[in-house]
């Protein structure tokens, strides 16, 4: 007996990240190879023709799991009964634009989308914000959806997590799949703190294996933090395929579980690790039965505290920068 289809809403559906994302969702990479999906695609009125072109390609793949597609410029149509909402679309920073202007432009988008989710989405909707500034956009959406549980709102730090995994594998010579217990703390921005103090590869401590404080401080942390900029520099375009891959990883693990393995998600703080409540902050989590659970009780040394507080300061500044826009 086929499972009932799940509704997956994707915003920014005509964009580059969505182009790398939609075919994989339709192929079963997001929710499982036995789970039919209905894609509900949102983009601006002027992008509707482009979205139709993408849907023609989706049709031409004849995906067995794709049970339907909705194309719209109305958030209330896109989010209707959505089980998963991938908020990919955001206002990009244009030349000469101040960060506060970027925050305001996105606050407008994410208050509207949060309110629409509040009104029409499934009460168990799993929301992942990919569009930057992702943590603060997720915070705005969460605050605009008072009737939905706060825990439903997450921000994507999985790209940073995957970038850090790849750097650690290259440095240690260990297979990337063998690395466990990596954490990335804070904001999805260059201030984030990738932390491998607890990490192991094939049961060995990575800290002992690598044993190079200077590399951690001067190479590893900045490389992970500035990787997005390095890709733009090299490619002339932002990292779309790797971002889409990270979004798939994030939601798949949230829905299907991590078997006790740590992954990083930006989630609303409960006050632990000295992070004020409700701030959407990257922390290590495990996932089981469709729920994430933060890894608790990790020791925070002086260097880590400084890094964690630095990225928190940026998040607090962003929160305060949009406070007047939230009712």
Curated annotation (Swiss-Prot):
GO biological process, one term: tricarboxylic acid cycle
Residues at the catalytic site: 188 (proton acceptor)
Catalytic activity: (S)-malate + NAD(+) = oxaloacetate + NADH + H(+)
Binding, NAD(+): 12-18, 106, 113, 130-132
Protein biosynthesis recorded as keyword: no
EC annotation from Swiss-Prot or TrEMBL: 1.1.1.37
Keyword NAD belongs to the record: yes
Domain of life, source organism: Bacteria
Keywords: NAD, Oxidoreductase, Tricarboxylic acid cycle
CDD domains per the UniProt record, alphabetical: MDH_chloroplast-like
Similarity comment: family membership: Belongs to the LDH/MDH superfamily. MDH type 2 family.
Xref: PANTHER family: MALATE DEHYDROGENASE
Role description: Catalyzes the reversible oxidation of malate to oxaloacetate.
HAMAP family per record: Malate_dehydrog_2 (MF_01517)
Name the record gives this protein: Malate dehydrogenase 1
Taxonomic classification: Bacteria, Pseudomonadati, Pseudomonadota, Betaproteobacteria, Burkholderiales
